[in-house]
Amino acid sequence: MAIKIGINGFGRIGRLVLRVALGRKDIEVVAVNDPFIAPDYAAYMFKYDSTHGRYKGEVTASGDDLVIDGHKIKVFQERDPANIPWGKSGVDYVIESTGVFTKLEGAQKHIDAGAKKVIITAPSADAPMFVVGVNEDKYTPDLKIISNASCTTNCLAPLAKVVNDTFGIEEGLMTTVHSITATQKTVDGPSHKDWRGGRTASGNIIPSSTGAAKAVGKVIPELNGKLTGMSLRVPTTDVSVVDLTVRLKKAASYEEIAQAIKKASEGPLKGVLGYTEDAVVSTDFLGSSYSSIFDEKAGILLSPTFVKLISWYDNEYGYSTRVVDLLEHVAKASA
C-alpha cells in the first residue's frame, strides 16, 4: 500500500520533496498546504525552477488541484495546521516544511488535524532528530513527530561518524560555506536578531551562526560537546561545503583517513556519503542526491592527529532526498 503524504509549506524544500517523492513508487502525494500559494501559482512554481531547471513532466492546475502527470494533488491554503483536512484527505504522514512549526507543540497540530506522523524538515529544539545513515535505526514507532535535522547536519554527521568510528574525534570545529537561503535579503534590510544577516545576500560573504555541528552531538551522543561551528553565507544559489577540522584520538595519515571514508561510501553509507578525487567546484554538485560528498583532493593534514576534511552537499536536493528516505524508513518501521 502506498505511503500517503501531505506537504505543509511549498517553498524550496517542499517543492523538491514533491519532485523526489513523485519518483518513488511507494509514495502517493495526496495534498499540499500553503496559505500563500493558490493552485495555479503552485503549478507555476513547481514547473519552473531557477536552480534545478524545468520539471520535465506535465504540470497544470484544475480547480483546487495541482495536477502533475495526470496525478491530482489537493491544494489547501490554511494558516493554522490544525485546520488542514489531512484526516479527511487520507494523509498519514505530513512533511512539515514551512520552517515555522519546528517544535512539538506546533507540529502536533498536524496530528490533531488527522495525520498519523510528522517529519519536520528543519532542526527542532524538542523533537527527536534523525540523520539517515547515522542514527535512523534508533527510530521507534511510538515517535509521532521527528526532525530530519538540517542540511548541514546531514552533510557533517556521516563524515564525523566515519572519522569518529575509525580514528576517534577528540574535538573539532566546523565551518559551512553556505549558499543563499530564503531568509536572507536581496538588499540591505532589517534583521533584528542577526544584523549581519540583513545585509545584501548577492554581494557579501556573511558570517552567521549555525547549530549544525552541535546537533551532531544529538545524533551521535559520543560527540556531544566535542563539535561546534559557524557558517559563512556566500552569493551562490545552491550547493554548500563543510570544512571539518578535527583533532584525532588515533594517529593516521591523510591517505588512511580518505580510504576509511571511501570504504564507508561504498559500503554502509552508500547513497548517503559520496567520494570524489576529481578537481570539482560547487556547481558540479547541483542536483546531487548525496547528503555529503567527500572531496579527497581538498583536505589537508598538519600532523597525524590534526586534519581538515572537506565535504560538499546540495543543500536543497540532497536534503530533500533524505527527507523522503527518512519518510520511507519511518513508514516501514511503523508498518
Curated annotation (Swiss-Prot):
GO cellular component: cytosol; extracellular region
InterPro entries the UniProt entry points to: GlycerAld/Erythrose_P_DH, GlycerAld_3-P_DH_AS, GlycerAld_3-P_DH_cat, GlycerAld_3-P_DH_NAD(P)-bd, Glyceraldehyde-3-P_DH_1, NAD(P)-bd_dom_sf
Annotated site residue numbers, Activates thiol group during catalysis: 178
EC number: 1.2.1.12
SUPFAM superfamilies assigned to the protein according to its UniProt record, in alphabetical order: Glyceraldehyde-3-phosphate dehydrogenase-like, C-terminal domain, NAD(P)-binding Rossmann-fold domains
Pathway: Carbohydrate degradation; glycolysis; pyruvate from D-glyceraldehyde 3-phosphate: step 1/5
Chief location category: cytoplasm
Active site: 151 (nucleophile)
Annotated family: Belongs to the glyceraldehyde-3-phosphate dehydrogenase family.
Oligomer status and interactors: Homotetramer.
Name of protein: Glyceraldehyde-3-phosphate dehydrogenase
Organism encoding this protein: Candida albicans (strain WO-1) (Yeast)
Organismal lineage: Eukaryota, Fungi, Dikarya, Ascomycota, Saccharomycotina
